[in-house]
Every structure is written in structure tokens, then in C-alpha cells.
């Protein structure tokens, strides 16, 4: 193996640049050349590929987003499009590939592996929704961003004795909502994986005000319901003032936390180690604080298991 490529695909996540840096410098330290591929699989097919050096990744570890840029490219599901990507890999002498992203990115990596190219997937997703890893790159930063925002929201909620329904990211996974809910002392956490009783939530909020509380915070995962709609439903059972707030894409931005930088660096270096061993078609993970890898194909039949003990814990702490 003389040259590897690296790309980021799908939604960006803080820490991706740290992973790119680790892959690049680990490969170079082992005598392997590195090519960066801009704009994910779309850039691969278009041939937007360039040589990377140690200097290319200098001063990138603290930056949010991905300096290789990203793009969603559903067309890569088609065999004809995949073959165009293969042509570009051959043209640039790329022997193997590291892909950083989520579910769609892993599907692309699997397709390339089936075409004879060793590909390794790194879990880059703020949602923490990828199986066989306790932790995805970007999750910690997103949680800290949401936590800081909710701390500020609580200030104005207290000033006006209001309830705020705060929408956080997590279409199918409530990990951000659970962690941030506990960290901010939320009155309720609402996630896709658990049933909820909106009337009960309203009653608990009313009881809180009756007991002297000056605010109410409901952390709502985006996959459950629109925040405005949830707020309106809540007001059917409560006589308090309420507002909805959608944190949105701010959770994807910002300088990555220490944890995201370190984990991304460890995963990036581990991906190169696997490629040096001639392995491919694998997804890197962090399980019980240890680096692991699994066949990418296994991920598609598996389900991410969040720390639902946090959900139960918050119910007790919010009383």
C-alpha cells in the first residue's frame, strides 16, 4: 500500500478535522502518501482529489466542521456512479480509503470494499447513533454546545417564569437529549426511543411552579415532534407561559472539545493501523474506552443502544 485517500461525508461533526489530521500524519509516518478528497463521494466521482502533507493538516485540530468539506450524494448508491469513483481512485493511485461520517458514508465504504478497495469507516456524527461504538466523533461538542445554550435559555425562562421546549438534534436517537437533559437539570426529556405522556409532563411542570420553581425546561429530540407543535400540545394541559426554541445546526459547529479531539485522533490513527495490516470493510468504534472494529456489514443489522439509564435518572432528579 503506497497511497490512501480520505474523505468526509454526510453531516459534518466537530472533530472531523482532528481525525483527518491523525490519519494523515500516521500514514506519512509509515511512509504512505495521503490524498484528500473534497466534498465526500461527490468529490471522489468528480476527481476533486489532492496530495496532502503534514503541513496541510497543521492548525486544523481546533477547527470545527471539515476542511475537506462534505456533501450528501445519494447517487453513489448506483453501480455506474460507484465505478466512476473507482476510476478516480485508480487514476490517482489510491490503494485504500478512510471515510468519516455516518450511516450513508458507511454504505459507500462498503460498496467500495466490494469493488476490491479496502475502506475503513470512522464514526462522525453528532447524534451518537452508530452501532458498535459508545461514542461518535462530534457528540461531546454537540452536547456541550446544547448545554451552554440551554443554560442561557434558563436565565430568560426564570426572568419571565416560563417553560421552554428546547429542540435538540437526534432524528432517531435521543442521546443528545438524554445527556444534555441530565446536565441542565431539565424537567422532562422526550426522545424517540421512549413513550411519553404530554399531560403528565404538563402536570409535573405545573406542580413545579406551585412548589416555587421559576422556570421549566423540556428537552425534546427533533425526531419526536416539531417543537412548536409540542409546545402547543403542552399548553392544552397547562396554564403556564411557554416558548419553543430550536437549537438546530449550531450543534454541528464550533471548536471541538478535548474529548472529541482525542477520540478522533485515536480513531484516525487506528484506522491507518488496520489498513497497514491489510484489513478493510471495517468500522472503527470505541467500546468500554477501548478501540474496536467490526465488519461494516454488521452495522446495518445492528441497533445503537443508548444509555437509557440517564432517561430514568432524570425522571428521579426532576421530581
Curated annotation (Swiss-Prot):
ADP binds at residues 21-25, 154, 185-187, 213-215. Mg(2+) binds at residue 103. One of its GO terms (cellular component) is 6-phosphofructokinase complex. The keyword Metal-binding applies. Its cofactor is Mg(2+). GO terms for biological process: canonical glycolysis; fructose 1,6-bisphosphate metabolic process; fructose 6-phosphate metabolic process. Substrate binds at residues 125-127, 162, 169-171, 222, 243, 249-252. The keyword Cytoplasm applies. Belongs to the phosphofructokinase type A (PFKA) family. ATP-dependent PFK group I subfamily. Prokaryotic clade 'B1' sub-subfamily. Catalyzes the phosphorylation of D-fructose 6-phosphate to fructose 1,6-bisphosphate by ATP, the first committing step of glycolysis. This is ATP-dependent 6-phosphofructokinase.
Amino acid at each position: 500500500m503506497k497511497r490512501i485517500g480520505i474523505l468526509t461525508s454526510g453531516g459534518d461533526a466537530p472533530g472531523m478535522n482532528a481525525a483527518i489530521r491523525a490519519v494523515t500524519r500516521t500514514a506519512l509516518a509509515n511512509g504512505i502518501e495521503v490524498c484528500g478528497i473534497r466534498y465526500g463521494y461527490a468529490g471522489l466521482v468528480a476527481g476533486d482529489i489532492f496530495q496532502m502533507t503534514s503541513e496541510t493538516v497543521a492548525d486544523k485540530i481546533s477547527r470545527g466542521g471539515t476542511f475537506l468539506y462534505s456533501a450528501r450524494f445519494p447517487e453513489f448508491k448506483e453501480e455506474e456512479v460507484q465505478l466512476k469513483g473507482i476510476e478516480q481512485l485508480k487514476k490517482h493511485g489510491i490503494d485504500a480509503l478512510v471515510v468519516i461520517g455516518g450511516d450513508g458514508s458507511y454504505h459507500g465504504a462498503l460498496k467500495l470494499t466490494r469493488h476490491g478497495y479496502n475502506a475503513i469507516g470512522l464514526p462522525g456524527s453528532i447524534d451518537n447513533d452508530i452501532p458498535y461504538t459508545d461514542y461518535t466523533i462530534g457528540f461531546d461538542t454537540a452536547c456541550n454546545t446544547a448545554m451552554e445554550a440551554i443554560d442561557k435559555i434558563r436565565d430568560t425562562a426564570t426572568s419571565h417564569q416560563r417553560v421552554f421546549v428546547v429542540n435538540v438534534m437526534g432524528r432517531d436517537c435521543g442521546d443528545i437529549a438524554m445527556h444534555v437533559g441530565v446536565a441542565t437539570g431539565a424537567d422532562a426529556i422526550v426522545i424517540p426511543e421512549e413513550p411519553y405522556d404530554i399531560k403528565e409532563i404538563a402536570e409535573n411542570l405545573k406542580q413545579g411552579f406551585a412548589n416555587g420553581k421559576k422556570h421549566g425546561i423540556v428537552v425534546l429530540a427533533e425526531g419526536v415532534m416539531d417543537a412548536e407543535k409540542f409546545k402547543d400540545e403542552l399548553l392544552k394541559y397547562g396554564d403556564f407561559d411557554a416558548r419553543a426554541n430550536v437549537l438546530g445546526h449550531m450543534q454541528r459547529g464550533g471548536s471541538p472539545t478535548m474529548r472529541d479531539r482525542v477520540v478522533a485522533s485515536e480513531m484516525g490513527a487506528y484506522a491507518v493501523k488496520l489498513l497497514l495490516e491489510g484489513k478493510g470493510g471495517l468500522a472503527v468504534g470505541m467500546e468500554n474506552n477501548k478501540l474496536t472494529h467490526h465488519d461494516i456489514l454488521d452495522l446495518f443489522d445492528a441497533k445503537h443502544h443508548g444509555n437509557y439509564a440517564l432517561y430514568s435518572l432524570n425522571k428521579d432528579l426532576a421530581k
